[in-house]
């Protein structure tokens, strides 16, 4: 794209999307994981095409799972995090403790027991490490998940 009277000025070159071209002949010296390949273009001339290569990382997880009724459903953020944590319950996602009590779903009213069998949890009291370090996000998430003591 040329602007009024600024022909062949490399500082003002942009591609069809408005992105500036790199200066000083950096076309063959790209540091990204792209490679150039000449492909046949119009009238038999070669055109340069950039090819973006994927990293090949296998750390991603599927965003859907079997819904138990022959179909698929999207996973939520909680399920994805549970899969990545060690000791996560991938197959047994809904596990409620059974028992009798008069305190409702959160235990018999004393703060012990509960829907996930977490006896003795009293909130944030005593949750610090004693060294003045703050907990990370993953530590906070691990505390909230059942079976991660």
Curated annotation (Swiss-Prot):
Residues 100-117 have a biased composition (Gly residues). Residues 1-149 are annotated as: Disordered. Residues 78-93, 132-149 have a biased composition (Basic and acidic residues). Keywords: Stress response. Induction: By abscisic acid (ABA) and water stress. InterPro entries: Dehydrin, Dehydrin_CS. The keyword Flavoprotein does not apply. Transmembrane segments: none annotated. Pfam families: Dehydrin (PF00257). GO terms for biological process: cold acclimation; response to abscisic acid; response to water deprivation. The keyword 4Fe-4S does not apply. Belongs to the plant dehydrin family. This is Dehydrin Rab15. It comes from Triticum aestivum. The gene is RAB15.
């Amino acid at each position: 794209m040329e602007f009024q009277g600024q022909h062949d000025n490399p500082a003002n070159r942009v591609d069809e999307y408005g992105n500036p071209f790199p200066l000083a002949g950096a076309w063959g010296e790209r540091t990204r994981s792209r490679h150039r390949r000449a492909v046949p273009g119009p009238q038999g001339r070669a055109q340069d095409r950039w090819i973006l290569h994927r990293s090949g990382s296998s750390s991603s997880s599927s965003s859907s799972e079997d819904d138990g009724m022959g179909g698929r459903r999207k996973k939520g953020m909680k399920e994805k995090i549970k899969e990545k944590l060690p000791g996560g319950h991938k197959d047994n996602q809904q596990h409620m403790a059974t028992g009798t009590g008069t305190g409702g779903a959160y235990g018999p009213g004393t703060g012990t027991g509960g829907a996930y069998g977490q006896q003795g949890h009293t909130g944030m009291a005593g949750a610090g490490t004693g060294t003045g370090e703050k907990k990370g996000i993953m530590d906070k998430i691990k505390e909230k998940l059942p079976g991660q003591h």
